[in-house]
Regions:
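N-terminal secretory signal peptides that target proteins for export/translocation
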Residues: 1-10
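Carbohydrate-interacting regions of secretory-pathway proteins
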Residues: 26-246
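Bacterial N-terminal signal peptides
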Residues: 11-24
């Protein structure tokens, strides 16, 4: 009787230990989807993979795999060829508080041609923009207006520009046109941030520093150029890698 009782107690103890271990594992944070652009099909991009659209000759310079942008004038450089389905990883950091920049996906060939020839108004193409904005931009807005902006954030907005179209994933901006990030994940001025972008069949998804944050679907156009933006302040990009998909 005693030995049987002891065996029952020992068995119950083992089950309790397993239950507690399982609970501890389930409470642990999930690993981040940190995609670094390594593996089959990925290609490192540099100066030779971009063409100037409407920037000055000295706006962009490349050294040891890092793209340095002065921010002046406002404009873009584009991929040599347009793309449809692809993945992108890139790291970026602003060198000045309140810096503004972006990565354009599917920038329309018509708008790029118009910018190159100076035939259209504005300095930026039509397409889907993945915003690259420093915290200082939001802080300056909040100080001036006494509240947070309802039309932009500094943590990875995704939105259409010009006549381009997109159905944004929630949460949305006040006007319903932008996909706001579900979390505040970007780091401040001088610190490197990591973006992973998936652009497939007219759908865009953005991961910020390893966590999915924003995106949209039903994008038009869904074919076009990949562009890096110069918009007023110095910024650097590095470890830019692209995988073109069928």
């Amino acid at each position: 009787m005693g030995s049987t009782y002891s065996r029952l107690l020992n068995g119950a103890g083992c089950w309790l230990a397993l239950i507690f271990a399982s609970c501890a594992l389930s409470a642990a944070p999930l690993p981040k989807a940190f995609i670094n652009g390594e593996g089959p099909g990925w290609k490192a991009w540099g100066a030779a993979d971009f063409a100037n659209v409407n920037c000055a000759e000295d706006t962009w310079s490349w050294e040891d795999g890092v793209a340095h942008c002065t921010g002046k004038p406002v404009g873009v450089i584009r991929s040599v060829e347009p793309m449809t389905n692809f993945e992108l990883v890139v790291e970026w950091r602003h060198l000045k508080s309140a810096g503004n920049s972006g990565v354009f996906l599917w920038a329309s060939p018509e708008s790029i041609k118009g910018l190159e020839k100076g035939e259209i108004k504005g300095r930026l193409p039509n397409g889907i923009e993945v915003q690259v904005l420093d915290h200082g931009f939001s802080e300056r807005y909040e100080k001036k207006h006494g509240k947070k902006s309802d039309w932009f954030t500094s943590h990875g907005d995704v939105f259409p520009t010009g006549p381009a179209e997109m159905t944004p994933f929630p949460p949305l901006s006040g006007n319903g046109k932008r996909s706001f990030p579900s979390k505040e994940l970007t780091k401040g001025v001088g610190e490197w941030n990591h973006y992973y972008v998936r652009a497939i069949n007219g759908e865009v998804r953005l991961w910020v520093n390893g966590e999915e944050a924003s995106g949209g679907t039903d994008c038009h156009p869904a074919t076009g150029y990949l562009c890096l933006e110069s918009e007023g302040s110095p910024i650097e990009f590095k470890n830019l890698r692209v995988r073109v998909l069928p």
